[in-house]
Amino acid sequence: MKAPSNGFLPSSNEGEKKPINSQLWHACAGPLVSLPPVGSLVVYFPQGHSEQVAASMQKQTDFIPNYPNLPSKLICLLHSVTLHADTETDEVYAQMTLQPVNKYDREALLASDMGLKLNRQPTEFFCKTLTASDTSTHGGFSVPRRAAEKIFPPLDFSMQPPAQEIVAKDLHDTTWTFRHIYRGQPKRHLLTTGWSVFVSTKRLFAGDSVLFVRDEKSQLMLGIRRANRQTPTLSSSVISSDSMHIGILAAAAHANANSSPFTIFFNPRASPSEFVVPLAKYNKALYAQVSLGMRFRMMFETEDCGVRRYMGTVTGISDLDPVRWKGSQWRNLQVGWDESTAGDRPSRVSIWEIEPVITPFYICPPPFFRPKYPRQPGMPDDELDMENAFKRAMPWMGEDFGMKDAQSSMFPGLSLVQWMSMQQNNPLSGSATPQLPSALSSFNLPNNFASNDPSKLLNFQSPNLSSANSQFNKPNTVNHISQQMQAQPAMVKSQQQQQQQQQQHQHQQQQLQQQQQLQMSQQQVQQQGIYNNGTIAVANQVSCQSPNQPTGFSQSQLQQQSMLPTGAKMTHQNINSMGNKGLSQMTSFAQEMQFQQQLEMHNSSQLLRNQQEQSSLHSLQQNLSQNPQQLQMQQQSSKPSPSQQLQLQLLQKLQQQQQQQSIPPVSSSLQPQLSALQQTQSHQLQQLLSSQNQQPLAHGNNSFPASTFMQPPQIQVSPQQQGQMSNKNLVAAGRSHSGHTDGEAPSCSTSPSANNTGHDNVSPTNFLSRNQQQGQAASVSASDSVFERASNPVQELYTKTESRISQGMMNMKSAGEHFRFKSAVTDQIDVSTAGTTYCPDVVGPVQQQQTFPLPSFGFDGDCQSHHPRNNLAFPGNLEAVTSDPLYSQKDFQNLVPNYGNTPRDIETELSSAAISSQSFGIPSIPFKPGCSNEVGGINDSGIMNGGGLWPNQTQRMRTYTKVQKRGSVGRSIDVTRYSGYDELRHDLARMFGIEGQLEDPLTSDWKLVYTDHENDILLVGDDPWEEFVNCVQNIKILSSVEVQQMSLDGDLAAIPTTNQACSETDSGNAWKVHYEDTSAAASFNR
């Protein structure tokens, strides 16, 4: 016995009876009926089951009894579904076996969710309501011309008259034969011979409907739908209505108490509503924001066998039967219909039967507007609100809308996709501190351009994708190292060799290293007293750490500083003293430094935790120093990869650009400092270079020769050694970076420090950290002039990019006072991982500011923000940046593979609080900062009030693509969860209420277009699906008028998109989105 294609299994007691065709059964059941698949989770409503019994027996539903200890709903597992049809009336019904469950697995949840996407209705069929002439004994059945041409086999019009035999089978597999002829005036398609026998046998009357269905084998099937007629009421002596009700309720209560299966029968033509609802559909309805006055649509079957949506308004929310079924969700919405002819529409409906209208404004505002949370990978668009938001918006649901009985890992009230996303995206807890992998000696090419992340092309820090609480525990560095090791499988052999050599020396070095580190840390703690005596050694910086921040950061700075060569220390001290010579506010933080010194004395135990890591690093450095020939052989044997060739092209491009550009003007006030800085630095670099060339890597010296950093970084080194090279590069170039690293807490300092330059994890281009914003603009500008003409292309690249950091500087003194006593600064976002602002250096007068300056975003107004500690002004308009061809998007697009085509899982969305303290405008790197109306509200007073500048807010991922349609709210979808274009069009049509109008792009009045990563406008469906998923940036649904306007204007951006409640920004153009009603957009988002 063959099972139906849709997975419905017949019951075993049917013997060899052939199962009913599922498509024909659903066609006879009606266009709104779709049974859930076997093995899925459903919600059974006993109250609705009793309504079906009452409707079939013509009884009133006002007196349906209840049963003790039977809840108003049961979550059950659907074990089997058997399709039936009455042999006399051909009325269809289904037999279902349900089993109440308290906990369930993920497969059942997925089956329930996938069941909503299955369309069980036939695709090729026609339905006609019979007329009086159709049911007469001599007339025949008149078939509509288009239906006959589509469903019936083609006629041979060479015959006179054209005619053929039609064979069709009904639900009981009975064969019926009709004569199909094309005749009459006017000519029409008729079924003549055999039709009158069919009508009399089935006892059809005018008003009944007949369906012809053609299956996938082109075989015809025949079914009927009977009109709803008054049937004679059964005598109470035959069967009792109350006994029927009590019987079905008792069976459900017994099954619920014992978790045993029970059987029900569902009659789709007699039941007023479905009382076995898929769990996914039920959850989806719960998380819709339903409130009084809300507009909605509801589907109804029409007289011509079609489907129509009726518009209505929610007028009340209450229990249908507050006495017997208190707190039940069955028909708990009172509704009113727009059309006066909708008198036969029900006055009460259930929440899962309606479709809320997607509009930005409501007739009566609901008590809660849903915020635009980031959409997790695999999450449907309408299932985003959490349990507390749902309770606030729907207080009538009480406390039992979730699964109180479910003793499973799925939290009460959470939807299917929310639970799945929590299982898949379980963040790293703050207490979990993973150990560094053993393969720390893996080699890494600094010029590896094979990454999809554009920020890695200039050695920018990778986006921080970990949770905010874990960024202080060094997991980001571990993840970054692991990614680099995975990207270079060719170096596995060399890694193993280095690991073996490292393990031989590790035990010998460990004890000696522990003693030296303790001695050096004690010496450095004593040396910090020099600062209080007013000497020039400002390099011993102390970080302003919050109490909940790990305190090993400053200790590791001390340790690294003690390992710097003397020449490097003197050079950095001289540079820092010259760059900060005019800063009189430096002495105001003496008390803070004393406090930090006391704090560091209590943290000496932190060094012991890092001994294992430090010993491995030192032994690795010695291995590298002892085996220079091996490194050279590896360099010679390695051939240039395509990524290296791309790097060379990029470097040549940079050289050409720098030759065309002139040196930025420098004010006369900075000329003495710049000249003295250049002379001192050149002298110190020569001493450092000569001393390092004479003395190779000494035991315990955690540094590299300075000559290494003046050469193109092509030596294969480990990630830690690369960080050390970058740090010494800062020393040599006179940079005064004190930015925190991945996994370290941000610190605020009073002066540039050499301590953080010696830190292992400091990146040379972490140039938007909080410390750098608080007082290093002068040194950055000076170093730009000194090294503008560096011969090294890579060094020019570092210098040129770092010199263009000029926006978003905050008042250092105010920031220091704000952060010193701020104890809850735990979820700060590393701004350098999210974006960087490039602006030309402009010199202007000093403007003192004593309050937090608002960030200078690229708005329409020409606003200037001045750094309070340096003679530099920073333009707020970013338009001047895009004119620089060096940082234009097309250059990187031509040079870098997959530019702008970064995986969607690394595009981060920043919260409004995080954006409000920094300035992000990067014309060369695509970046999506999230919902634009959050940026629109950047000038709110919330920046100054409540919670401070950095409220506790976790970093969130954005992996979804925006979809816009004029006159509707913008939506966001995850294109990766669709399997093809058909499913995408169907879902978009459902979202925007245009079902059936997007599926056929040739005949539809709507055109689905998208913008790719090159800002080209293309028609959806032309490219292969995989390529479309990788390059789509946004999608627009255009009407025919908008398509004509676009063809005339030649620009998709010229088409107005009014009342877009939430939309994202295009790649690169960070703040280019405007609202016609900003206040309405902001309030809708909040």
From Swiss-Prot:
PROSITE patterns: B3 (PS50863), PB1 (PS51745). Induction: By auxin and ethylene. It is found in: Nucleus. Interactions between auxin response factors (ARFs) and Aux/IAA proteins occur through their C-terminal dimerization domains III and IV. Disulfide bonds: none annotated. This is Auxin response factor 19. Its main location: nucleus. It comes from the Eukaryota. Residues 454-504, 545-564, 624-647, 659-788 are annotated as: Disordered. Residues 486-504, 659-697, 711-724, 772-785 have a biased composition (Low complexity). GO terms for molecular function: DNA binding; DNA-binding transcription factor activity; sequence-specific DNA binding; transcription cis-regulatory region binding. GO terms for cellular component: nucleus. The lineage of its organism: Eukaryota, Viridiplantae, Streptophyta, Embryophyta, Tracheophyta. One of its GO terms (biological process) is response to ethylene. PANTHER family: AUXIN RESPONSE FACTOR 19, AUXIN RESPONSE FACTOR 4-RELATED. Residues 126-228 bind DNA. Belongs to the ARF family.
